Amino acid sequence: MLHTPIGRLRTMGFIEGMSLLILLFIAMPLKYWAGLPLAVTIVGSVHGGLFILYLLVLAYATFSVKWPLKWSAAGFIAAFVPFGNFLYDRGLRNYK
């Protein structure tokens, strides 16, 4: 899966999506229910870095595959919609 630009994009999308799940369902409850705001600081920073990396991998895939602009635009929009990258991944799986 990591041998193609689309495979790398799908993998990065999954990792970035999982970091959002960890942020929402583990770090946020730790902050508000257990009084540990550092959890959100750490996980939020990691998620932000992964988000930027996802956008870089999207740009790499766009120029490597030379696919239509709609795929790049959809990936960019999906990056800003919570859990949108999981829906985008379904489309990428069918794109191959």
From Swiss-Prot:
Membrane topology summary: Multi-pass membrane protein
Protein name: Uncharacterized membrane protein YdzA
Alphabetic keyword roster: Cell membrane, Membrane, Transmembrane, Transmembrane helix
GO CC field: plasma membrane
Keyword flag Cell division: no
Any Pfam family hit: DUF3817
Transmembrane listed as a keyword: yes
Main location per the UniProt record: membrane
Domain of life: Bacteria
Organism: Bacillus subtilis (strain 168)
Compartment(s) where it occurs, according to its Swiss-Prot or TrEMBL record: Cell membrane
Transmembrane segments: 14-34, 38-58, 67-87
